Amino acid sequence: MTSRRAALGSEGGARIVDRGYQHYTGERRGPGWAVLAIATGTMRRSLGFKRPGLAKLLPFLIVGFAFFPGLAVIGFRVLFTGRLPRGVLSADRIFPYDNYLNWLHLVVLVLAALAAAEALCPDRRQRVLSLYYASPIRPILYLFGQVVAVVVLLLLVSVLPPLILWAANVGLADAPLSYLTSHLDQLLRIIAAGTLIACLYAALALAVASFTERRAYAAGALLGGSLAVSAVAGIIRGTIKDRWAQYPGLVDPLFLPARTTRWFFGLSLQSQISGWLYLAAAFAIIAVACFAVVRSYRSVRF
């Protein structure tokens, strides 16, 4: 037997020299760093790092769609300052922040579908959750890391682009300091609206992704389901004139963020429903979606 192994080793050009196990001698940083590693790894995968072809291109196209309108407005103002009447180049007239956020919430929805599917589906399909849970990472910490990854990624496209536009408007104003003090409330409204949009779509996307192991199914279900619910709610609002017909908008994933954003910016909702009720509906959807994710992972077999 020994001679046969030696012969095989000599013919194949490879042989076993030694076997054994070594203890990990690196720094042990605890569960917090493990959660951070999960979050950063998910963000990198969601943005297409170390992935081929379309998986790398599509996320950056989505992020580009988020930043392009704001950068275009900034470029227009820089190029035509002094050539057009001052009122024409007013920041609020060219591209109001609420309009920008209404555009962004559609972009955020698409990115949420991709990011949440990338966060939850591969580990379940490859049956590696037991490897996470064998470490100090408990299921709730694992989910927390994935939630952080998706929310931070969505904040990148829901808050940062309008913040850049706001900062540019401050810098391009005739009296930047005066503009800053008089428009500081706009900064807070941008942060509040963008954060709500990111959290709402992150919760919905993660809830959908927690029920399937395939990324395409998760992304398709979120996008298709959102369009279907929005279409039904829109038909009800458009065809039925009773007051109750406006309430399906509280569960419309496309209509609800737009109404809440208008309310944040003090604009008319053109509805008998209070802005507080829209906000409460958004929080309720987030809570139900988070409950669905936790409940789904309690029943996962691995």
Where are each of the predicted segments found?
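Short, membrane-interfacial amphipathic segments enriched in basic
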Residues: 24-40
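Short, contiguous pre-domain boundary segments
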Residues: 10-29, 293
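Membrane-interface helix starts
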Residues: 30-33, 43-62
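Terminal transmembrane helical anchor/hairpin motif
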Residues: 2-9, 80-92, 216-299
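Secretory targeting signals
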Residues: 144-206, 210, 270-273
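Long, hydrophobic alpha-helical segments
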Residues: 63-69, 98-122
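Hydrophobic alpha-helical transmembrane segments of multi-pass membrane transport/permease proteins
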Residues: 52-78, 110, 222-230
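Helix-loop-helix units of permease transmembrane domains in multi-pass membrane transporters
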Residues: 119-149
